[in-house]
């Protein structure tokens, strides 16, 4: 056992270095969290300001006719629905961060999940004139993750690429039988962001949210794009199940 004679002035410098490292990490996490909260506040404030502006036009009788007034009311209603949806997402993410909501990792078949993601984004892609392609997936290929949250991550990243005006998005799987991981590749050609009538989360913030969610699905993120467009090619590395037996049905 170490004594005061083992360390000058009775200090264990190894322990002090460990404490300093832990302090630096916590400080970095606190700064990152503060920056994230600042960004989240800005993202929510923008659509709220839009709602206030629409109501102000109505209250000051600046509408040309009743039809325009109804249009402004409809826009405000659609925007507030977007705000509530975004608030629900942020609240859920905070519950995951503090542990009051626990992800449920389990062995799942990857092909049905990716097919479901394709169905969820297909209409959005058609409306944005974006070509979406899903590469072939081995029917028996499985990963260890939380089905619902992985699905949410993939949808959010595809929606972020759509919001940036990407004309083509691809989802493929790299399956090396000798590797312990499976990599889902998401490629999106750069495009010109279209104007949106309804205020929504910015593409950059969508990427931030999806990255935070990745921590809870057991995945690691690899940015394979260029320095000018780091999110144009992303790799999501997921572990294989310890056992291939008794795979549950995907939710």
Protein language model annotation of sequence segments:
Residues 1-32:
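Conserved signal-transmission helix
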Residues 24-57:
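Primarily the dimerization/phosphotransfer
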Residues 78-83:
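Short alpha-helical segment of the dimerization/phosphotransfer core of two-component systems
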Residues 179-208:
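Glycine-rich/acidic phosphate-handling loop/turn and adjacent ATP-lid/helix
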Residues 206-222:
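Conserved glycine-/histidine-rich ATP-lid loop and adjacent helix of the Bergerat-fold HATPase_c
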């Amino acid at each position: 056992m170490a004594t005061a004679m083992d360390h000058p002035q009775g200090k264990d410098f190894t322990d002090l270095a460990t404490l300093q490292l832990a302090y630096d990490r916590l400080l970095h996490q606190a700064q990152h969290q503060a920056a994230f909260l600042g960004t989240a506040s800005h993202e929510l404030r923008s659509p709220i300001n839009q709602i206030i502006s629409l109501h102000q036009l109505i209250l000051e009788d600046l509408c040309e006719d009743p039809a325009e007034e109804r249009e402004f009311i409809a826009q405000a209603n659609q925007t507030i629905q977007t705000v509530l949806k975004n608030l629900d997402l942020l609240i859920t993410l905070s519950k995951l961060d503090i542990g009051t909501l626990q992800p449920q990792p389990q062995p799942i078949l990857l092909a049905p999940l990716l097919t479901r993601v394709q169905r969820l984004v297909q209409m959005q892609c058609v409306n944005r004139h974006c070509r979406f392609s899903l590469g072939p997936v081995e029917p028996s290929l499985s990963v260890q993750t939380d089905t619902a949250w992985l699905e949410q991550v993939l949808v959010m990243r595809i929606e972020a690429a759509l919001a940036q005006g990407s004309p083509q998005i691809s989802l493929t799987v790299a399956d090396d039988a000798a590797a312990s991981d499976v990599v889902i590749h998401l490629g999106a050609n750069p495009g010109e962001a279209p104007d949106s009538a309804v205020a929504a989360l910015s593409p950059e913030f969508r990427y931030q949210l999806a990255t935070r969610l990745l921590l809870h699905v057991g995945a690691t993120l690899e940015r394979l794009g260029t320095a000018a467009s780091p999110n144009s090619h992303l790799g999501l590395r997921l572990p294989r199940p310890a056992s291939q037996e008794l795979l549950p049905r995907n939710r």
